[in-house]
Amino acid sequence: MSRVGKLPITIPEGVKVGLNDLEVKISGPKGELSKTFKGNIAISLEENKLLVKPLAANKNARAMWGTARSIISNMVTGVKEGFKLKLEINGVGYRAMVKGKYLNLMLAKSHNTKIEIPSDIKIEVPKQNIIILEGTDKEKLGQFASIIIKQRPPEPYKGKGIKFENQFIPRKEGKKN
């Protein structure tokens, strides 16, 4: 039995939930999210609580049970409070700036890297080496952050690169003569 899946999702005030078979639409003060789930689970709304239940006893249904519950819980949190990720850029001459709908990264390459900002994600660059991402969809926010990090992942010798704010980068010792 899934320990995550069996917990009910409490719907806070100001958040509206719409169910249409396996499609869940959640709207709140920060925006609206919708997601369609595959079979093997049943989603029901009872007394301001969402319940997710498996329809079969096989391994796939049990796996989707906990996953669907976590995704719906993140959707509720996203439309109510939103999510925020902070990225740090370490390295001499490494910078970030927002120009229109593009994030412009200068990462010691022969060219500047331009990344188009998705419409549902807000980017703030308070300093040249800090990027703050905000959005309602946790999955899209993490995906966009990984696209940014992929441009210059942190390296273990000098620690240069883009990383999450509190991410620990294990350091290696250089060559010995």
UniProtKB/Swiss-Prot annotation:
GO terms for molecular function: rRNA binding; structural constituent of ribosome. Coiled coil: none annotated. GO terms for biological process: cytoplasmic translation. Gene3D superfamilies: Ribosomal protein L6, alpha-beta domain. InterPro entries: Ribosomal_uL6-like, Ribosomal_uL6-like_a/b-dom_sf, Ribosomal_uL6_a/b-dom, Ribosomal_uL6_bac-type, Ribosomal_uL6_CS. One of its GO terms (cellular component) is ribonucleoprotein complex. SUPFAM superfamilies: Ribosomal protein L6. It comes from the Bacteria. Keywords: Ribonucleoprotein, Ribosomal protein, RNA-binding, rRNA-binding. Part of the 50S ribosomal subunit. PANTHER family: 60S/50S RIBOSOMAL PROTEIN L6/L9, LARGE RIBOSOMAL SUBUNIT PROTEIN UL6M. Belongs to the universal ribosomal protein uL6 family. This protein binds to the 23S rRNA, and is important in its secondary structure. It is located near the subunit interface in the base of the L7/L12 stalk, and near the tRNA binding site of the peptidyltransferase center. This is Large ribosomal subunit protein uL6. It comes from Rickettsia felis (strain ATCC VR-1525 / URRWXCal2) (Rickettsia azadi). The gene is rplF.
